[in-house]
Regions:
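Carbohydrate-interacting/catalytic domains
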Residues: 1-148, 176-186, 190, 454-457, ...
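Short glycine-biased active-site loop of nucleotidyltransferases that positions the nucleotide triphosphate
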Residues: 69, 204-209, 253-260, 377, ...
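Short catalytic/ligand-binding loop motif for oxyanion handling, primarily in non-cytosolic enzymes
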Residues: 101-102, 160-162, 202-205, 250-253, ...
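Substrate-binding/active-site clefts of carbohydrate-active enzymes
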Residues: 111-113, 133-149, 155-341, 610, ...
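The feature represents the membrane-entry module of six-transmembrane cation channels
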Residues: 154, 319-320, 369, 420
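A short acidic, glycine-rich active-site loop
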Residues: 217-221, 336-343, 452-454, 498-505
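Conserved alpha/beta catalytic core and glycan-binding cleft of carbohydrate-active enzymes
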Residues: 308-310, 328-490, 519-529, 533-589
Length: 628
């Protein structure tokens, strides 16, 4: 065999240590030329198999034509098949530890058969010519701590669809078709990043991509791996970052997938008390097994290094950290200290984040962690988990509870909007209004708001203004920036026709104005983790449900003052205490951007325990964003 594609002793050693970070360049299916014959090199890890062969379109799915040879004690099997070609389907035929016959998709496949088919597809991931050199070079200097990040969360299959036909029931846009449309929208709105859901092969559309069978394969619903790279490339050339949802917490029990891969629990724990998620009906990875850890960490590196993705949002982190997550007494096994912490998962996260961020400066690792686990964004060397950012689920829950209330009752729940500032600097946060909040009868963002339709729009504008003023990066799920009325469904596109109505059009423009102001003023993003850069002007005006606060820039120039009114009562002479005797320029109100601005001069009138103040005519559900 050629030297390049051969599973060497060094490969075996590193894989056994869990540190063969380029393992996906060896395991899987790779076009190669050996002994002057073109074909494909196949390799698979099946440590307890009795025998393995590769079957596919190149050998008429004959289980005896291409047996694979076991390489060393670690349990990797390899072979070279002359004449096998790019585009052909294949599987591994495994004689299991107990003699069972198993037909498995390739865990390291870079492409898969279109569902409901379950085979893997031969492809060449090395033949894409990137054109995003400028972006990749600049990325090395990107620092999430001091940079603007406004993320547009997108499900690619339902963002926008073709009209459905008999030949194309799904109506999906391909990655290449999606690229210019998505880039144009994101750029026009003013988002900095796109976060894509479901970009790993999954058999069931209704899982939204959270039950993965092909970790190294972009879903074939939307095209090839090369097409996916084109999407990333295109976004980068338009100066848009891309983050992927990534699901290392669990995997489904589909027979062609990872479950009982060689007739034994290879990727999962054998004991159901450790290896089963009762809530989700899925399997839990064995994070203590080096080869499994290697599979996942190399997968993260595959997306970041091979596909140029700028970061990963790690799903369901809490379910990995707690051994008793979603389980009753008797359904879980304590750790060696008798506790409920998953020590192996903790070490996995430290290893993962250290390697990914250490090898790829300027990328981000984001945790969806729903508990108060400490130091999620703390450095691994300081016993933190090493993530760059964490979703702020506490803020989200309090914010949504407050916003749903009839304005009369908000005064009794004023602390729901102020409480988050008591822990805002305990982690590095992203404020999220994600897909999870607009499904399962939770209503769309607009429909959550109280009152008549007109009031709903006003409430939402005020709420978004508060969100964009609050410390933390921002994330909005698709459709919520123009007031999608229906809940989200993966089976249909967003209700774009709503933009034919003035209210929806105005909301979309308003959100775009917020996005552009957010990016323009470092006060709103440059000191997110500096407690001295935030100051309440009045956090206690509960009777009138008005909040006012200051965001300071890292240089303390061009600071921002924000006032938000969450009742339908106008306050024509609302007095706002201010830090200094200066001019305060109104740059945005509830109608949107004010291109020329309007100046308010501070007077020597005591208000909000401050020497200076000015009167601002605050409309019903009105807001004011000022620079000074």
């Amino acid at each position: 065999m050629g030297k390049k594609l051969q599973f060497t002793e060094l490969d075996q050693y590193l894989f056994g240590q869990g540190t063969n970070y380029d393992i996906y360049r060896k395991l899987g299916a790779h076009p190669d030329t050996q002994n002057r014959k073109k074909g494909v090199y196949f390799a698979v890890w099946a440590p307890n198999a009795q025998a393995v062969s590769v079957i596919g379109e190149f050998n008429e799915w004959d289980t005896e034509k291409n047996p694979m040879k076991k390489v060393g004690p670690i349990g990797v099997y390899e072979t070279f098949v002359p004449g096998a070609k790019i585009g052909q389907l294949y599987k591994f035929y495994i004689t299991g530890a107990h003699g069972e016959e198993l037909y498995k998709a390739d865990p390291y496949a870079n492409a898969a058969e279109m569902r409901p088919g379950t085979a893997s597809r031969i492809t060449d991931i090395t033949n894409y010519k990137w054109k995003d050199d400028t972006w990749m070079k600049n990325r090395e200097n990107f620092d999430p701590d001091t940079s603007a990040m406004s993320i547009y969360e997108v499900h690619p299959g339902s963002w926008m669809k073709h009209p459905q036909t008999a030949e194309d029931e799904d109506g999906f846009y391909s990655y290449r078709e999606l690229a210019p449309k998505l880039a144009q929208y994101v750029k026009k709105m003013g988002y900095t990043h796109v976060e894509l859901m479901g970009i790993a092969e999954h058999p069931f559309d209704g899982s939204w991509g959270y039950q993965v069978t092909g970790y190294y394969a972009p879903p074939s619903r939307y095209g090839t791996p090369q097409d996916f790279k084109y999407l990333v490339d295109y976004l980068h050339r338009q100066k848009i970052g891309i983050i992927l949802d990534w699901v290392p917490a669990h995997f489904p029990k589909d027979a062609h997938g990872l479950v009982n891969f060689d007739g034994t629990a290879v990727y999962e724990h054998a004991d159901p008390r450790q290896g089963e998620h009762p809530d989700w009906g899925t399997k839990i990875y064995n994070y203590g097994r080096p080869e499994v850890k290697n599979f996942l960490i190399a997968n993260a590196l595959y997306w970041v290094e091979e596909c140029h993705v700028d970061g990963l949002r790690v799903d369901a982190v809490a379910s990995m950290l707690y051994l008793d997550y979603g389980k009753k007494d008797g359904e879980w096994i304590a750790n060696k200290y008798g506790g409920n912490k998953n020590l192996e998962a903790i070490e996995f996260f430290k290893h993962l984040n250290t390697v990914v961020l250490g090898r790829n400066h300027g990328t981000v690792m984001i945790a969806e962690e729903s508990t108060a686990w400490p130091m999620v964004t703390g450095k691994a060397e300081d016993d933190g988990l090493g993530f760059s950012l964490k979703w702020n689920m506490g803020w989200m829950n309090d914010f949504l509870e407050y916003m749903k209330l009839d304005p009369y009752f908000r005064k009794f729940n004023h602390n729901k909007m102020t409480f988050s500032m008591t822990y805002a600097y305990s982690e590095k946060y992203v404020l999220v209004l994600s897909h999870d909040e607009v499904v399962h009868l939770k209503c769309s963002m607009l429909e959550k708001m109280p009152g008549e339709l007109d009031d709903k729009f006003k409430n939402l504008k005020a709420g978004y203004t508060f969100m964009f003023g609050h410390p933390g990066k921002k994330l909005l799920f698709m459709g919520q920036d123009f007031g999608q009325l229906r809940e989200w469904s993966e089976a249909r596109e967003l209700d774009w026709y709503l933009l034919g109505e003035e209210n929806h059009q105005k909301l979309q423009q308003y959100v775009s104005d917020l996005l552009h102001i957010y990016r323009k003023y470092p006060a709103l993003y440059g000191a997110d983790n500096d407690p001295s850069a935030f100051e309440w002007i009045n956090a206690n005006d509960g009777d009138r449900s008005i909040f006012s606060f200051v965001r300071k820039s890292p240089t303390r120039r061009n600071n921002i003052l924000i006032v938000c009114n969450f009742t339908p009562v106008a306050r024509p002479d609302y007095r706002v205490g201010v830090p200094k005797k200066k001019q305060y320029k109104l740059i945005m109100d509830e109608q949107g951007l004010l291109p020329k601005g309007k100046v308010f001069k501070a007077e020597k009138k005591n208000c909000d325990n401050r020497e200076f103040s000015f009167a601002y005519p605050l409309e019903a559900y009105g807001v004011g964003i000022f620079t000074y």
